[in-house]
Amino acid sequence: MLMPKRVKHRRVHRGRMTGKATRGNFVSNGEFGIQAMEPAWITSNQIEAARIAMTRFIKRGGKVWIKIFPDKPVTKKPAETRMGSGKGSPEYWVAVVKPGRVLFEIAGVPEETAREALRLAMHKLPVKCKFVTRETEMGGEANES
């Protein structure tokens, strides 16, 4: 499971997931990737499940990049606890994902294999995604250059 080694603050505010991703919204390392179409919190368990689904399908060929990292702690109070007495203890870690963010990248495999591997990963995630290549952008058109 992915989580930070050290954090400055153990508990953080929930925040808002407005707007589109301004960083990490194109394929940079690999040849193919999946891009989020809606905002969501993706937990470290979901990231790991998607990674395992991809790597099992491509077997030994290819390389996979995880482009998101769960750096936000989500707290939870114990069951049957009265309100008050402070914020709960950190329960799990999430990555805040906005529309347009590339979540996973893959290289070294044919496009059909990459498409199927990334499709399997998409089913493990709580966010609607689309398959993108190094040529396509958020709008879906290919670059002229």
UniProtKB/Swiss-Prot annotation:
One of its GO terms (biological process) is translation. InterPro entries: Ribosomal_uL16, Ribosomal_uL16_bact-type, Ribosomal_uL16_CS, Ribosomal_uL16_dom, Ribosomal_uL16_sf. Residues 1-17 have a biased composition (Basic residues). Keywords: Ribonucleoprotein, Ribosomal protein, RNA-binding, rRNA-binding, tRNA-binding. Pfam families: Ribosomal_L16. One of its GO terms (cellular component) is cytosolic large ribosomal subunit. Residues 1-22 are annotated as: Disordered. The keyword Cell division does not apply. GO terms for molecular function: rRNA binding; structural constituent of ribosome; tRNA binding. Belongs to the universal ribosomal protein uL16 family. Binds 23S rRNA and is also seen to make contacts with the A and possibly P site tRNAs. NCBIfam families: rplP_bact. Part of the 50S ribosomal subunit. This is Large ribosomal subunit protein uL16.
